[in-house]
């Protein structure tokens, strides 16, 4: 970069000043990129070192500002192959260093990708300090100011603007008690088939997937052995059972599982009639349907390096995770057996029904991004529905 180019870049950054105001009054300054519009949401941190496009397109991040702890973001751009859903549902992206794309797979820069999706971003933030703050004090409601418009009561002065933004963060309703699954689910049912198995479609088992925010790679894994019908989150148990499924899959999704009451009732009606497998939000909903309760974690689990112990085998799996709530250990009913635990904080990571064909895990065995240590769980589901 020439001196003139560097000076032009520096001047442009000065004109795009932005800040992230946390509800506890802490302010982080940076430079705006992506869509130039302000947002309010909950700040979380993700410890993954790569896979930012898969993270951005994970519907489980609806309503949240995602802080990436990796030092540099954007250098491999974005492409159509790494998309995990039909859109971006997160409220914003927070990074340390942003770089323009230089990769043969890239079709669009991250900056332009965020602009097209209407998602604001901020870079130049001390993400290490922000992550430590969230770790020590818990996830925070926040206001992200990236627009050119003045904010606050009179738009005068940086301090007044920041104080106004902090108050907006405090007044936001947050994720607790909110049903975001109904906001990210599909509008109508659709079918997913593996191209390699299409000739044998009629002989494959039929899996109905409840879409609470399902990721594309989950559907790919299911389609490796089944005909998959994806249905909206509020589809009744009666309608699902009329489809004569060999198994029902409960997908991942965002926000508070206790608020998704309609799904809990549907799961109760399905249990015992066909095998059930749940992931992430689906795990929490299955557990609630069986009598357990969920609660909020201090700063959640977000990343692709979380160690989980399989209690049956003693094996430790490195897993991809994305959740702010978890099943509370003291509420697990007699009918459920805990199968997996998190080695960082001993929270529940998996359960199995003792008498019915139903099991679930809190983490993401499909990876995307992340390791493949737990893909065997899809094979367990296949064996269960093919008995």
Provide a role label for each language-model segment:
Residues 350-387:
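A glycine-centered loop/beta-turn motif at secondary-structure junctions
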Residues 206-211, 319-320, 359-363:
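Active-site-proximal beta-strand elements of phosphoester/diester hydrolases
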Residues 2-243, 257, 368, 380-387:
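RNA-binding accessory domains that recognize and position tRNA/RNA substrates
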Residues 32-33, 70, 321, 352, ...:
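Short clusters of small/polar residues that mark proteolytic maturation junctions
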Residues 242, 246-247, 252-318, 326, ...:
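Cysteine-nucleophile active-site neighborhood
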Residues 126, 280, 323, 364:
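Active-site glycine-centered loops adjacent to acidic/histidine catalytic or metal-binding residues
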Residues 314-356:
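Catalytic beta-strand/loop cores that center a nucleophilic Ser/Cys/Thr
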Residues 120, 206, 275-277, 293, ...:
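Proline-centered loop/turn at the N-terminus of a beta-strand
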């Amino acid at each position: 970069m020439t001196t003139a180019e560097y000076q032009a870049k520096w001047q442009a950054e000065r004109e795009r000043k932005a800040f992230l105001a946390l509800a506890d009054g802490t302010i982080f300054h940076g430079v705006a990129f992506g869509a130039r519009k302000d947002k309010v949401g909950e700040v979380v941190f993700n410890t993954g070192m790569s896979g930012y496009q898969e993270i951005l397109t994970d519907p489980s991040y609806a309503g949240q500002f995602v802080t990436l702890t990796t030092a540099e973001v954007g250098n491999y751009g974005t492409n159509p192959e790494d998309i995990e859903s039909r859109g971006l549902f997160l409220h914003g992206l927070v990074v340390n260093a942003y770089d323009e794309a230089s990769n043969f797979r890239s079709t669009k820069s991250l900056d332009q990708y965020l602009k097209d999706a209407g998602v604001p971003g901020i870079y130049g933030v001390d993400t290490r300090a922000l992550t430590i703050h969230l770790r020590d004090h818990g996830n925070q409601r926040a206001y992200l100011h990236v627009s050119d418009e003045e904010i606050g009561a009179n738009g005068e002065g940086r301090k007044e603007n920041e104080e106004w933004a902090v108050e907006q963060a405090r007044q936001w309703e947050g994720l607790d008690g909110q049903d975001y699954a109904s906001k990210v689910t599909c509008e109508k049912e659709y079918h997913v088939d593996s191209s390699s198995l299409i000739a044998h479609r009629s002989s494959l088992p039929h899996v109905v997937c409840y879409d609470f925010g399902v990721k594309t790679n989950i559907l790919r894994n299911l389609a490796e052995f089944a005909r998959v019908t994806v249905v909206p989150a509020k589809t009744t148990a009666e309608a699902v059972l009329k489809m004569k499924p060999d198994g029902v899959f409960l997908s991942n999704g965002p926000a508070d599982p206790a608020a998704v009451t309609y799904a809990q009732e549907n799961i109760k009606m399905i249990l015992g009639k066909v095998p059930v497998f749940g992931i992430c939000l689906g795990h929490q909903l299955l557990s609630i349907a069986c009598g357990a309760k969920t609660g909020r974690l201090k700063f959640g689990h977000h990343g692709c390096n979380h160690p989980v112990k399989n209690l049956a085998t003693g094996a430790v799996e490195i897993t991809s995770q994305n959740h702010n709530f978890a099943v509370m250990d003291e509420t697990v009913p007699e009918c459920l057996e805990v199968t997996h635990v998190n080695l960082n904080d001993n929270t529940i990571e998996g359960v199995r029904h003792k008498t019915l064909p139903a099991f679930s895990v809190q983490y993401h065995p499909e990876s995307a991004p992340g390791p493949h240590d737990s893909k065997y769980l899809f094979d367990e589901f296949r064996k269960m529905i093919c008995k």
